[in-house]
Amino acid sequence: MTLKIDRSPRGAPAAPLQSLPYDSLGMDAESLKRGILGHLEYTLAELPQQVDSEWEPYVALALAVRDRMIERWVRTQETYYRRDAKRVYYLSLEYLMGRTLGNGLINMGLLDECTKALHELGYRLEDVREAEWDAGLGNGGLGRLAACFLDSMATLGYASYGYGLRYDYGIFHQRIVNGAQVEVPDGWLRYGNPWEIPRPGDRFRVQFFGGVRSSMDEQGRLVKEWVDTRDVLATPFDTPVPGYGTQTVNTLRLWAARAVEEFDLHDFNEGDYIGAIEARARSENICRVLYPSDSVAAGRELRLAQEYFFVSATLQDIIRRYKKRYRMFDEPRGARVFDHFADKVAIQLNDTHPALAVPELMRTLVDLEGLAWDEAWRITRATFGYTNHTVLPEALERWPVSLVGRMLPRHLEIIYEINRRLLDEVGGRFGPDDARARRMSLIDEAGGRRVRMANLAIVGSHSVNGVAELHTEILEREVFRDFHEMWPDRFNNKTNGITPRRWLLKSNPPLARLITETIGAGWVTNLEELRGLAAHASDAALGLAWRKAKRENKLRLAETIVRQYEHRGMALTVNPDSLFDVQVKRIHEYKRQLLNVLHVITLYNRLRDGHGSSIVARTVIFGGKAAPSYWMAKLIIRLINGVADTVNADPAARDRLTVVFLADYRVSLAEQIVPGAELSEQISTAGTEASGTGNMKFGLNGALTIGTMDGANVEMRQEVGDDNIFIFGLTAAEVAARRPHYVPGDVYRNEPSLARAVDMIGGGAFSPGEPDLFRPIVDSLLTGGDPFLVLADYASYMACQERVATTYRDESTWTRKSILNVAGMAKFSSDRTIRQYADEIWGVSPVRVE
């Protein structure tokens, strides 16, 4: 019996039609112009002279650019099949892609020609691209990291696919009304998405609920069958992901949920119009929003349904693609078919959301393909890698056993069997140790039985990585210590990175041009070349040009701030000569926006006390979303806006201190904020932030960092040098040592400026109509134990901010440090991170597409 390898591309007919020559559409302005006009007339049925908005030209341009991507896209897939490349499949519930047009033009080398083509048609590129909505596929750093990784995998030429869900409404659109966050649907798909291509021919059926039937096969083996299920269809939508300066165009495949039977004609004819579409609504709810609220039982069920729907459809697709290439014609199922699976397939789990892929692959191999358990487990473990993104215990997913058993009965059986074998292995390795067994078990028996998804991902993977050196140390030493003691070689670090194409070349053209003029353009694909800037850090001419570029970006950001506040019906003046002090990220207590607010209030009090001459003028910029059910984070947003209203209305603070909260923080807004920032606030409690990538984006754009020794800040300090970063606060070890004896009230009583600021918050100074509004924040700090040690780090933070102010007064010193920060970002490219994944986890090499 021989294994037959099918080397034809998917769906290729026996006698393929003659295809057009590659790049036949042309990459010049005239060809692009013809493409734009053609799509306006023949796709959109619009005459150019009748177009009266930017949407139609945007769509026509996007389709013209996509046409050129597709030529390379098809060639890329043909090359992967011909070369029999090992594929990498990146599974993430989030992809914070931002806008596709600008990034696509840069990566395809079409920016200048496209600008020229639009100009000849009477449009400006900067106007047309504003018509594009940010893709509503992510929330925070997890999704943005995934997007950077896709860019790097395509640029480096790895045969890779991103898999995710096609959310109808994303996370939410954030509005600020009377200082409070109001969530409204993010209708990013309301006008369609010109970049995606639906693939209804590749849809799969995903099962839920039902039961498990046991029987014996002809060989006397126990066979399990999942029966009486409620099914949903998964339909894929593909988006091309072009690499920079290469012929490679990879794929992001997103699943949409559809009902098996979308419309019940009998119910409709009986007058039950709602019931007629009930199945459709129930199915489509799976992909309605990212992270439905888990504060109610229905929300928890929907979240679990999302996660399983995602991994089931994805694994069916991966196995379909594999079996097309490696299959026995005389034995369509069995172990031999999957002999090469782990050699040709690498699956990376981005956090625990896709962890159900472990029991799902086991179910597929054992129940559907007839493999023995041990062989299936060997393949499963050799296929998966797991990336952890948190050290916070409450953020490690755990699902009620009762819920898993009801929705996924066969998977719970498989999880139980994996757990039984795991605990036997633990006992054989360490002897009788009930405490260790309880900690390592896949089932948490305390406070209601729950499935520990992180433990499941660790046990089912051959690699477990953290995303910063400190983060990985904490995982090995504390969070997953038992697993590290059992499998030390399984754990490794892969410090996060960002793509310099989006976060410098695209978002900051003035600085990108200046860097290229100074050291050449090689940094775009080899960030190590930024180190060459260090030799020019004291050059006066470069310093002058550097400040000019920063001021240009500050003016652009100031315009954005004023425009957004005008849209909210508020007048605001921004001093472009002030220090732009920025903290934009998800609103969470551990990220300590509260510490920043306390500093702002302290500065405000100094101004009111007549000490304005000693204070460097600042514009303090906040941004970020709070989870809809996270009431404390939402209260912090109200506090920030309350402080902003008070400070900005006081003549004592005019031109000296301005406080801003930019609503609906997203990638396209970040591309305006990051280049204009001068001080980057990375002030989480040490030992709580896994890595962070915002710190890298700001550093790459010349902002100096004020931060704790947390996450990637530790490595940034090593790269830029102690003199070029502002470090304060307790270390992770000091935090752990202090917690058991920490009395926040003592700090409050011993720091008069702190006590004054806290009392103002609790006394209604920033909520005059509701004096007790912010009392819960004060209670959390003073009587709730101050869990993230905000008060403990206050004095150190204030002293560090004084050092910031002193340095900022000396513009040449600040500029030199800014240049050295950019030079020090050489390590933090997602290209470097992806190479490490490829070499050390996935075992893949680049595939050159001609």
Task: Label each residue range with its predicted role.
Residues 2-850:
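A conserved ligand/cofactor-binding region detector
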